[in-house]
Amino acid sequence: MSDKKKNAEEFEETFSDKTSEDESTVENETVEENENEDVQAISEVDDLKAQLDEMEDKYLRASAELSNMNNRFRNERQTLQRYRSQDLGKKLLPAIDNLERAVAIEVEGEQNESLKKGVEMTLESLRSAMQEEGIEEISAQGETFDPTLHQAVQTVPATEDHPAETVVEVLQKGYKIYDRVLRASMVVVAQ
């Protein structure tokens, strides 16, 4: 029996060694598979993070672009509203010039005085309406010549009363709406 017992023990040792080898091989394969799965999962997570970052960047850019567009539209709307009377003002300037010429004429008689008074009231009403819209006269008489505001149509020699580059006489009034010139003043400039 001792031989049988010995053989049985040897068989058990051999079987146990083989089983241990098989188990360790299986464990190694399982560990390698788990490591591969972990690497793949980490790679997928990194890819998803990169995609998320890209999408967040696109979202932020689109949001900033939308905000810029809204600001630009608001500014354009304000500019349009501010200068809405520009064309009408340009069209009214000849009428104002004519009314000013009519008021400058000397009249005789009560009826003519009454008519002149009506023209003055009409002129004042137009000036007031234009002023409410931001249209105002450009001051020129005695001012330094500014080519952005004045149009020199004639020059005269400079004197002590009228130094060089100053406006001596205004031939036609100029007007501006806020910071835009509707019509430059036609002036005589000392040289």
UniProtKB/Swiss-Prot annotation:
UniProt biased composition (Basic and acidic residues): 1-21
Q: Where is this region: Disordered?
A: 1-39
Superkingdom = Bacteria
Q: Name one Pfam family in it.
A: GrpE
Keyword Cytoplasm carried by entry: yes
Where does the protein end up? Cytoplasm
Q: Biased-composition ranges for Acidic residues? A: 22-38
| Role this protein plays | Participates actively in the response to hyperosmotic and heat shock by preventing the aggregation of stress-denatured proteins, in association with DnaK and GrpE. It is the nucleotide exchange factor for DnaK and may function as a thermosensor. Unfolded proteins bind initially to DnaJ; upon interaction with the DnaJ-bound protein, DnaK hydrolyzes its bound ATP, resulting in the formation of a stable complex. GrpE releases ADP from DnaK; ATP binding to DnaK triggers the release of the substrate protein, thus completing the reaction cycle.
User: GO:BP terms for this protein?
Assistant: protein folding
Q: Annotated Gene Ontology MF terms?
A: adenyl-nucleotide exchange factor activity; protein homodimerization activity; protein-folding chaperone binding; unfolded protein binding
Q: Which GO terms describe its cellular component?
A: cytoplasm
Regarding protein family, the annotation reads:
Belongs to the GrpE family.
Summarize subunit and interaction data from the UniProt record for this chain: Homodimer.
- Report the InterPro entries cross-referenced here: GrpE, GrpE_coiled_coil, GrpE_head
Q: Which UniProt keywords apply?
A: Chaperone, Cytoplasm, Stress response
Q: What is this protein called?
A: Protein GrpE
